[in-house]
Amino acid sequence: MDINITIFIFLCAALLMLGVITTKFSNRLGVPSLVLYILIGMGLTSYIYYDNASITQLVGIFALIIILFKGGIQAKWKHIKPILGPSTSLATFGVLITAVLVGTCAKYILDLTWAEGMLFGAIVGSTDAAAVFAALGNKNIKTKLTSTLEAESGTNDPMAVFLTVSLIELINEPSTSLWSLPLDFVLEMGLGLLLGLLFGFLSIKIINNINLDSSGLYPVLALSLAIVTFSGTTLLHGSGFLAVYVMALTVGNNDLTYRLSIVRFTDGFAWMMQILMFILLGLLVFPEHLLAITWQGLVLSFILMIIARPIGVFLSMIGTKYTGKEKLFISWAGLKGAVPIVLATYPLIAGVEGSELLFNAVFFVVFTSALIQGATLSPLANKLNLAGPDQEQSPHILELVSMGKTSSEIIEVVLKEGSKVIGKELKDIYLPSEVLITAIVRGEQVVTPRGETILENHDTLYVLIPKAKRQEVKKMFQ
């Protein structure tokens, strides 16, 4: 084997290991892991010359598909439904207001044309799904706020992509008409929503009804369907990112075969893609170029975090049932991450004049946003009394892993208050002969099911069932 190939493989493995270890340090330091991944990439620029924006964009888009799929499949519709209106307003009007304000300031601070200034604003106007999901994942912040922020970050990428592509087209072709843009936006978002739902229900049918030779193939199938959703929707001129998130949300909130396997595989794969993506983004920038725009970058970061984002949030959430403190927290939690940097590669590839300055300025703003805002989310939530109770998650997960075809699966059933089986012994509960309770998780303990075992509120049951009886069995424990 070629020695260069071996070195490349070793380097990739070393970077992934370094990224995993870095995550442990980021939790202890209170710094978002993406900041450390970017620093790793920037530190390697002295040894590795890398300036391929096209490959970075391709990896970034692929990573965002996986991250959006992960976020959507783990989101609960019961949490999303009450905040759908506010999060949609944030993802559209909020992004637009933020983009215009930041773009106007960037025009004068960076000495850009109006179109270039608005392009900068469009690129940094949206929050980032990877950054928000990672920052909120282990924080004890109220569900209402985390759901709002996650829904916003999962749905505002299409707005930023649309504005970025439209402004690049306007810069390269000044004769482009602006009057058709609102209609184009509505059609693109509408098509993304409809195709996301269509692909979502189609994916459920495929995953639940296909009988594969190994359970390990189901997560691969699910991710393949997510990629097909993105590419198919994009080819039809719809919003591929919106379609992926809606598809994942649809799949995740319906009965799904091998759900836990799919979620665990997706979670691990998303982490790997995040590490790779942020290191590549760090490699793409040269530290000396950032130093040349230090004061401009700091001023724009300050304007975005302290002025533009809060104004966008407060204006787009007029009339909603959110307190001033909650709006303030949402304003501060608008983390930037991979999406703006990936979008900043669009003008580079399109050959827009001054695109290198735009890329470096975007990178500076994203880095400072992730570092400052990401590190202060929890203290701010505590200061504003918006921290919820610590969420205790059971360390135990049980699932049927089959080496071949099977018609059975293990489902997870959580006993909620009001369940008719709470307080009963297992021997007094009628279950079909082919249904078996294999384990009961109570807090951090695993209870062996016996006939005299009494079921309690919040118990998690792992039940072996025929796939065809999933709904019937779930109703027995309601």
Please provide the spans of the model-predicted regions.
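Transmembrane helical cores of multi-pass secondary ion antiporters/exchangers
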Residues: M1-E392, G404-K405, E456, E472
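Extended boundary segments
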Residues: R28-L29, Q391-K427
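Short secondary-structure transition/capping segments
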Residues: G85-P86, T406-I411, I437
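Short aromatic/hydrophobic contact patches that present stacked aromatics
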Residues: S89, E412, Y462
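Residues that form generic nucleotide/phosphate-binding pockets
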Residues: K383, I429, M476
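Cytosolic Rossmann-like ligand/nucleotide-binding regulatory domains
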Residues: K416-A468
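Short, compositionally biased
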Residues: T453, V473-Q478
